[in-house]
């Protein structure tokens, strides 16, 4: 990857519940980011997205020029024309070119991304599941996330979000991989970014409980047998005591 380039970040509107007295002291029940768009000279590339409570509501696929809903519920009562996003990206590109000409082109500081891999639900062998690769602290928003299975590149069954914005102006991105857990397979999430000296591999493999050894099984069976025999002996003793204590009372009652 080449060194970092200039990027422009435009955000139109933040909000949910605002008052006329300033927003810094307000605790809102819900927060939405509308019209978050980024364009950068590397590529060139960019993205446009709407977010709600930290989740991506939808993004616009700039290549296909269509709106892609990540929260389908919202698409039932609203729509978004992707042409609006394309106009915003074009404006950002124009402004970026002006800023480049007027600046000294000082490269932004490349942050080191933080990578975590975990399953969506508890792992059970043979039961379909999803692996999640959560990449945080991304800046600038140029990154490549791929999956490896047993050391080989995975070519299908995965998807990812666009860049999600954070309050500190860094970004996060999440990649999903559907898989069938097996004790013979292991996975790696491979992350490439300008903040890394070399690609980062985050390893994951299912944690399968180790089978009991033959000695352990023998001990467990022996303990179970002993407990069973003790139970039989104790039960027999109680029955005999009960018969002895009940004998005289039955004899006296017949007189």
Swiss-Prot record:
Q: Where is this region: Alpha-2?
A: 121-204
Identify the main location: membrane
Q: Where in the cell is it found?
A: Membrane
Sorted alphabetically, which Pfam families does this protein's record hold? C1-set, MHC_II_alpha
Q: Which domain of life is it from?
A: Eukaryota
Query: Transmembrane residues, as ranges?
Result: 218-240
Q: Which residues lie on this side of the membrane: Cytoplasmic?
A: 241-255
Record family assignment: Belongs to the MHC class II family.
What name does this protein carry?
SLA class II histocompatibility antigen, DQ haplotype D alpha chain
Species in which this protein is naturally found = Sus scrofa
